[in-house]
Regions:
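Intrinsically disordered, low-complexity terminal tails and linkers
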Residues: 11-28, 38
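Short, low-complexity cationic-aromatic patches
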Residues: 30-32, 52-57
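C2 and C2-like phospholipid-binding beta-sandwich domains
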Residues: 1-18, 45, 51, 58-60, ...
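Short amphipathic beta-strand segments in non-cytosolic proteins
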Residues: 62-69
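A structural motif detector for short, solvent-exposed N-terminal "entry" segments of globular domains
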Residues: 36-53
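Short glycine/proline/serine/threonine-rich loop/turn segments at secondary-structure transition edges
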Residues: 95-100
């Protein structure tokens, strides 16, 4: 085992919600109105061994925000995966902030039984509000450690 922490890379790009008519933008300091955050679940590295002695991991990610779930495709038999799948998260008025956390859960797909939870991490509502309020067109990426039962998930990789 390599014993490195299992980590997920997320990318975010701030944008406007497409509309039939262009909106009149207020002054730069007054951020309000609807916004879209394009959240990309980029990749995961250092997954743990999940499927018995010989099996690796069949990971997929579920991103949950304001009651809506977004799911990546399942990657088979691996200790790392690249998804680069983008989901559009919308908010009606950024001036009010965001009250919901964003939860990302990693799962191990199983053909014959219930899928197993690998672990998860949360992006706090306050941080989501900051992201939604960032300048339109701005983007960045962040790496998150996957947590299970209060501890960092450690990868197998070999």
């Amino acid at each position: 085992h390599d014993k490195k922490k299992c980590e997920v890379v997320l990318k975010a790009t701030v944008g406007e919600i497409p509309r039939a008519f262009p909106s009149v933008t207020a002054s730069h300091s007054d951020v309000s109105g609807p916004r879209r955050l394009d959240f990309t679940v980029a990749s995961v590295a250092h997954l743990p061994k999940m499927d018995g002695i010989f099996g690796k991991c069949d990971p997929y990610a579920v991103l949950e925000f304001e009651g809506i779930e977004y799911r990546t495709e399942t990657k088979k038999n691996t200790y790392e995966a690249v998804w680069d799948e983008t989901f559009a998260l919308d908010t009606e008025d950024v001036s009010k902030g965001v009250s919901a956390n964003c939860l990302v859960t990693l799962w191990d797909w199983d053909a014959a039984s219930k899928d197993d939870e690998i672990g998860c991490f949360t992006i706090a509502a306050a941080r989501m509000s900051e992201l939604f309020r960032a300048d339109i067109g701005s983007s960045g990426s962040e790496t998150f450690s996957v947590i299970d039962k209060g501890k960092a998930v450690v990868g197998h990789d070999k």
